Regions:
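Catalytic Walker B motif of ABC-type/P-loop ATPase nucleotide-binding domains
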Residues: 192-196, 201, 431, 504-509, ...
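Hydrophobic anchor residue at the start of the ABC signature
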Residues: 181, 492, 511, 522
Length: 556
């Protein structure tokens, strides 16, 4: 039976984890990637980064972060040889082993294929059977214990019943990722490149991965938006349109350094604006003084009965002086404005702001959800009776496959229960990657909000969407052209700014496939929501940031 608790996490409550992870048996390596002025161009010739990339990657664990679309996947392919640079060069000292969700999407026929070890394993097996070729001898060199290493790696990954011949189609998304990570453990590569390795992993598997990373003695390049995983790295590189920024330390130090840089940039902008204001005030005073001086000179000339030729000469001199002063002042103003613009470019954007409609607020005591003798389909554990009132924030946790998504779909009316009932007493909305993908691809966000009878006038909608960092460049685009993070924010806006705004949000792994900044923006938006939340997520930091009032542990 599921269990519900309120308030803080119970003392000593830890999720179960796969077996302990031994340190890699592969000796520590001096492997390094060297990026020397590396650039990559899109098919239309556009440079992906305004500054070419130069970086040395040696021993230790390097984290790579950045918004979706800045080229993290391209960088991974450049590092591992999947792409050739358009400029500069990539130097590799040794063999790299890549774990990447797009590779798993091709659904290799067997586990050995997904582990990247099928060819070497087949060579070892042919050698053992006395059928080896000369190529097999090369492939099997130093790999005599590969079958044992594979079995141990699969067991360490919590997959003791999986063999190299198991079809990948028989495994869940989380199990497929663990298979790929087991391949990295068993491979005798000099360096590991892990691209979003915690995707589809539940909390116990993420904890296992974090422990393994800390114990791994080979260089690791980790591309991730998982804040807990990024706490296991030694250095973080942030990739953006302008290129690379390097930060020493793990995620905590990265945040501290970014905050310090943001504070310094804000102070520099304030200083530049103050300097401009002071200089402009001085220019105005000097201009007024020149005007007074020229007026006095004209009066003196008239009273001195000077000749017309002399007066004309004085006038021409004054006009030339005025033109020179105007040009000089314009140059000064231009330089001051440029200094302010340059300082402003270094200032991070203000945090995304989300303001829900008053109708989304749930008052204390208002019944939100009631479950009566609910039995989920597919044999999931029963829910006896449960009811929730007021602006509750329920964290729904449990391992992959335990029925969390099924529960949310039954509550939302998308699946019928096997028995019993789930009754919603307030308007609701489902917020997940599927809901975001279901937005009408050909409609703009503004058009869709009008379709939903939003009570907000267009000007206010634009203002609110801009506060969510969905500016003019986004709201006029077809929603199919928006990124995953932008579509999720669009789905949130539609849920809470429609004619009948949602008072309860059902969130199913909403941060999957979001970059780190988009995750933080969604987190801040939900923190200010005054309705009720029911959130299923393996992102522990995301859950804790929402300050759950109830914790609903769903059994395996």
């Amino acid at each position: 039976m599921s269990s519900i608790s309120t308030g803080a996490r119970p003392s000593g409550a830890h999720p179960p984890a796969p077996s302990s992870v031994p340190a890699s048996s592969v000796p520590a390596s001096s492997f390094a990637f060297q990026l020397r002025d590396v650039q990559w161009r899109t098919p239309d010739g556009r440079a992906l980064w305004s500054t070419p990339l130069s970086l040395s990657i040696g021993p230790g664990r390097l984290g790579i972060v950045g918004r979706n679309g800045v080229g993290k996947s391209v960088l991974v392919q450049l590092l591992t040889g999947g792409l050739a640079p358009s400029g500069g060069r990539v130097e590799r000292a040794g063999r790299a082993h890549l774990v990447s969700p797009p590779l798993l999407a091709h659904d290799p026929r067997r586990v050995a294929d997904a582990m990247g070890l099928a060819a070497a394993l087949a060579a070892v097996e042919r050698l053992a059977a006395g059928l080896a070729t000369a190529d097999d001898l090369l492939l099997a060199d130093g790999q005599w214990d590969l079958p044992a290493r594979i079995a141990q790696a699969l067991a360490d990954a919590g997959l003791p019943g999986v063999s190299p011949d198991t079809p990948m189609a028989a495994l869940s998304g989380g199990e497929r990722m663990r298979v790929a990570l087991a391949g990295a453990m068993a491979a005798e590569a000099d360096c590991l490149v892990l691209d979003e390795p915690s995707n589809h992993l539940d909390a116990p598997a993420r904890a296992w991965l974090q422990r393994w990373l800390r114990q791994c003695q080979r260089p690791v390049v980790l591309v991730s938006h998982d804040r807990q995983l990024l706490r296991a790295v030694d250095r973080i590189v942030e990739l953006g349109p302008r290129g690379l920024s390097v930060y020493g330390g793990d995620y905590g130090l990265y945040v501290a350094q970014r905050d310090a840089q943001a504070a310094a940039a804000g102070a520099a902008l304030a200083h530049a604006r103050n300097e401009r204001d002071t200089a402009l005030a001085r220019l105005r005073r000097e201009h007024a003084a020149r005007q007074r001086k020229q007026s006095q000179a004209r009066r003196n000339a008239r009273s001195a009965n000077l000749s017309a030729i002399t007066i004309n000469g004085m006038r021409e001199t004054a006009e030339a002086t005025k033109a020179r002063d105007v040009k000089r002042d314009a140059g000064t103003r231009h330089a001051l404005d440029a200094a302010v613009r340059d300082a402003a470019r270094r200032v991070a954007q203000e945090p995304a702001v989300f303001v829900a409609l008053p109708a989304s607020r749930v008052v204390p005591g208002k019944l939100v959800l009631r479950l009566d003798e609910l039995q989920l389909p597919h044999g999931a554990a029963p829910v006896r009776d449960a009811s929730f009132s007021g602006p509750v924030r329920i964290a729904l946790t449990g391992p992959n496959g335990c029925g969390k998504s099924t529960l949310l779909r039954v509550i939302a009316g998308l699946l019928p229960p096997a028995a019993g009932s789930a009754t919603l007493h307030v308007p609701f909305a489902v917020l997940d990657q599927d809901a975001a993908a279901a937005l009408p691809a050909q409609r703009t966000l503004l058009q869709h909000l009008r379709d939903l009878d939003s009570p907000l006038p267009p000007a206010e909608l634009r203002t609110r969407l801009a506060q969510l960092r969905l500016g003019a460049a986004h709201v006029e685009l077809p929603m199919g052209a928006l990124s995953a993070g932008e579509r999720l924010k669009a789905a949130l806006a539609c849920a809470l700014w429609r004619g009948q705004p949602a008072c309860l949000l059902l969130l199913d792994e909403p941060t999957n496939h979001l970059d780190l900044d988009s995750t933080l923006e969604l987190q801040r938006a939900l923190q200010g929501f005054e309705g009720a939340l029911l959130v299923a997520s393996h992102d522990a930091e995301f859950i804790e940031a929402l300050r759950p009032s109830h914790r609903w542990q769903w059994p395996a």
